Amino acid sequence: MDDAVSRATNGHDAVEDMGSTTSLINRDLIRYARHIVLPGFGQEAQRRLRDSRVLVVGAGGLGSPVLLYLSAAGVGYLTILDDDVVDESNLQRQVIHRQADVGRPKALSAKDAVQRLNPHLVAEAVVARLGTGNALDLVKDHDLILDCTDNFTTRYLASDAAEITGTPLVWGTILQYQGQLSLSLIHI
């Protein structure tokens, strides 16, 4: 048994799941052993990732790697919101999409990719643009919003919905060789 796996499972080959929906099962302990053994992280933090619901707005240049890392890290529920379709010119930087996805909605392509990477998560694709008619409904059931869009209209709307619902918001932006990241923790 790998040393990190042994430490994550407390040296046991199998960890019983006593029917608790809050405990990690053996598969999770093995898959996420490298997280679990990090000082200050442990099984509780991994369980919290598994139980979290994240809304990712945008499955393009920034959303693509974000979605891959969230699924690999063990986030349990991802909602992927994007109204665009995969274009061949996207493929060199939007690494979540494949040649076979050209012409498909990015939200659906990304959903398929994260489920291939981690078949134990729940992923929902919403082929739509964040708008005044759907923002609050989309945001309200999530623990975190990640705004990976490239326009101010959507960014302001995501920020307003986060403030109204009290949902933490992280927005990122990239342009050529530069990037910015901001975290908004709303306390109502």
Give names to the regions the model predicted.
Residues M1-I186:
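Adenine nucleotide-associated cytosolic modules
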